[in-house]
Each structure stands twice: as C-alpha cells, then as structure tokens.
C-alpha cells in the first residue's frame, strides 16, 4: 500500500514541480538502497519561488521544514523522500536562540536570545502561522522534550532551576505541572514525557533513569553505564533508552506501574559524539554526530539494522510523517533525509540550494495564548501588544504540594 501511495504522491509532485526541472534534465524514479548500500536521488536545484507557488497551487505533499536558528532561516521541504525540493525562506521572529520543532512539525517553540517570553509558531500547509507568546512558560529552556504525539512538552531550565509540563499544545496550552529543581533527584540530562501528558521521566547526569510521579517521590527505574538518550514509545508508558557503555538499547515497560526491563538490541557500537534517540510508529532510531551509520530498531520484532550514511549527521529531527527524519541541513549543501518506514530504511538527498534570494521581514511576537495553571482558575498571563513587549504582572503558579517524607523501617 505504501509503495502505491508513494507512486501517487510522486506523480503529483512531478506534475506540480515540472517547471523546476532543468531543460533536458532526466530524473530517475526514487528507489531505496539494497542492504549495505546508499542510493541518493539527485535532482537539479529548483527555483524557490516556483517551488512555493507550485506547492500552493497543486497541493504538493509537504515533507516538513528545515531550520537554522543561527542564520534565522526556516524553509519548507516539498515532496517525499527521494523526490523533494527546498522552498524560499519563511518568516520567523528576529533574535532567536533556539527553535524546537514538535515531532509532527505542526508547530515549534521559539526561544529568544533575550527577553522573558517563549514563542509558539504554528504551520498550516506551506505557510507559517502567527507567533504566539506563551506567558509564564520558561523562555529559554535548556532541555525541551515533546510527547510522541506532540500535544505535551516538558521544559527545563538550569538557570531557573525548575521543570514545567505544558499540555494542550498547540491550540490550548496549559501549565499542568511545575517541579522545582530541589525536588528532582539529580541534575537533569534528559527528559521524556508520554502521550498521556502525565507520565514523566528524567535521565540524570549520573546515568540514572527516574520516573517523576505527580504525587510521590521520584522512583529509580534503572542505572546505566553511560545513558545517551531516552524517549517514550508512541501511545504507551514504555520508555526506550540507550546505554552507550553497554552498547544496548532497552525498554522500561509501564514506568508508572510495576516497570520491567526488556533488552531491545545489543552490540550497538560506533555511536561516539553527541547521540540522538527518537521514536516513531516504525520503531526507534539512534544516531550520533561522529558515526557514518545509524541504528534502526523495530520495537515489535526487536530487529536492529545498521544503516550506512553518506557522512556524519548533525541532527535526527522528525519530519511531518512519523518515521521520516532530517539528518543534515546546512545552507548551500544537500540535506539528508531518513525514511525508516520501509523494510529497508532509505537515505535520500534534497538538492543544495543557493543562498536565499530574499528574506521575509521578521515576525513579531504578536498573538497571545492563554496559558493557565491547572491548579487555579486564574490565567497566569497579562496581554501584551504586538510590539513583543515582555509579559508583566504574571503571577507565579503555585507548585504542587510536596509529598510526605518516606518512612524508613
């Protein structure tokens, strides 16, 4: 069924982007590599205005978005893996420090370099939406973890010494939980939040994995030799994690309940540098910045595949379709995309684009989202004007009461 859908989408893409083909240029149909090989679909660099116009007029599939916070650049990815093109830059607010895409790329959280307002930008089709200012949220989080379905985000700031959980994203954000740093078992290295918006796990700087119940003390689940990433599987309370010292990926099932350990794969070697771990409907993917291959794990069959790459990736960013990931993007160089939904994961290139011919005017933080404290009926924000002025007069939500001390027998 997927191959039929792929052929239909490819036919539509070729019709919508026919103006982008260089005269006489022949484009091979996309194909996926045999085991141990990398097949790259080469395309002529298209005209960006034509790409955006074709996408709007022909309903070309949107693969996702690519961004560079350092350059203030955000671009559309049109097409499907193996047949895709970059669009012209989209408008983003000026002065961004970080841009955190939700897993399905229907919205992103925007952290400013200065100021005390966290932004939220939604994406409808091929266009960016309005920018919302989420008053009361941590403005410059060090760690952001989304639930697999993207309706919940956990934010942590070392400078502020607190953790927040925001549910109802993107349309109705609500602050449902605040955890002071003093209530955390150790320095936060990783966070993971499940699709229920409640189940929350912390990976510490000393390689321990804890579940953080809403009521009760943090509970130790596992201690790894070198914890290098963790994420919940979609629609479950099961946590996938990677221990680089042991070369193992493992599953902690039902972390809020009895919790049990399941070995997913061992012998996962060569993952030096910064490690990325993501989950999707297709399984789990583990990659690193100093390895020219990655590991794909099927969570049902427990089969692990080593997938060769054309170089060392710089990210593992989920795209619009669950199981598609952006591995590399830099202006002037081809982008790399992983499609892990097929039996044999495929790597494809997006043609390198020239430097943007134009940049849209930066957007202001101009729309206000009501971010409510679930423990109080009082909204914790004050409206601001379109100039992007800081939120003022925002009452600090009251943290949940601490649980009684544990009795030792």
Description of each model-found segment:
Residues 85-91, 129-136, 174-182, 216-222, ...:
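A short beta-strand motif characteristic of beta-propeller blades
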Residues 71-75, 115-121, 160-166, 206-211, ...:
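Structural motif
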Residues 47-55, 94-104, 137-150, 183-193, ...:
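Repeated scaffold domains used in trafficking and secretory/extracellular systems
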Residues 10-19:
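Bacterial N-terminal signal peptides
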Residues 61-68, 105-111, 151-156, 197-202, ...:
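Short beta-strand elements that form the blades of beta-propeller/WD-repeat-like
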Residues 80-82, 122-126, 167-171, 212-216, ...:
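Short loop/turn segments that connect beta-strands within beta-propeller blades
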Residues 1-9:
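Bacterial N-terminal signal peptides that target proteins for export
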Residues 38-79, 87-103:
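Beta-strand-rich domains and repeat architectures in extracellular enzymes and scaffolds
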């Amino acid at each position: 069924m997927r191959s039929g859908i792929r052929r239909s989408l490819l036919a539509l893409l070729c019709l919508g982007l026919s103006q982008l083909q260089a005269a006489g240029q022949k484009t091979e149909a996309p194909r996926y590599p045999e085991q141990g090989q990398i097949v790259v679909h080469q395309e002529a660099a298209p005209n960006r205005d034509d790409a955006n116009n074709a996408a709007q007029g022909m309903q070309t599939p949107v693969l996702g978005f690519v961004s560079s916070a350092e350059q203030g650049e955000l671009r559309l990815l049109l097409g499907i893996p193996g047949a895709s093109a970059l669009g012209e830059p989209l408008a983003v607010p000026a002065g961004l420090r970080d841009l955190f895409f939700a897993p399905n790329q229907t919205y992103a959280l925007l952290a400013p370099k200065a100021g005390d307002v966290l932004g939220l930008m939604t994406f409808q089709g091929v266009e960016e939406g309005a920018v919302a200012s989420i008053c009361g949220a941590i403005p410059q989080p060090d760690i952001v973890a989304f639930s697999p379905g993207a309706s919940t985000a956990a934010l942590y700031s070392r400078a502020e010494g607190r953790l927040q959980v925001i549910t109802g994203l993107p349309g109705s954000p609500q602050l449902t939980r605040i955890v002071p740093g003093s209530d955390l078992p150790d320095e936060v290295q990783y966070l993971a939040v499940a699709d229920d918006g409640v189940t929350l796990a912390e990976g510490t700087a000393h390689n321990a994995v804890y579940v953080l119940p809403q009521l009760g003390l943090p509970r130790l689940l596992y201690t790894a030799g070198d914890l290098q990433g963790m994420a919940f599987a979609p629609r479950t309370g099961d946590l996938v994690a990677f221990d680089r010292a042991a070369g193992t990926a493992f599953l902690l099932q039902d972390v809020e309940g009895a919790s049990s350990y399941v070995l997913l794969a061992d012998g996962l070697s060569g993952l030096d540098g910064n490690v990325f771990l993501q989950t999707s409907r297709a399984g789990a993917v583990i990659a690193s910045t100093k390895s020219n291959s990655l590991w794909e794990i099927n969570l049902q069959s427990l089969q692990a595949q080593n997938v060769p790459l054309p170089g060392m990736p710089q990210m593992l960013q989920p795209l619009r379709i669950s199981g598609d990931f952006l591995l590399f993007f830099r202006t002037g160089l081809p982008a790399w995309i992983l499609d892990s939904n097929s039996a044999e994961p495929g790597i494809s290139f997006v043609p390198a684009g020239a430097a943007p011919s134009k940049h849209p005017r930066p957007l202001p933080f101009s729309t206000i989202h009501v971010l409510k404290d679930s423990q109080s009926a009082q909204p914790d924000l004050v409206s601001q004007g379109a100039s992007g002025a800081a939120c003022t007069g925002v009452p600090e939500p009251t943290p949940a009461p601490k649980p009684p001390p544990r009795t030792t027998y």
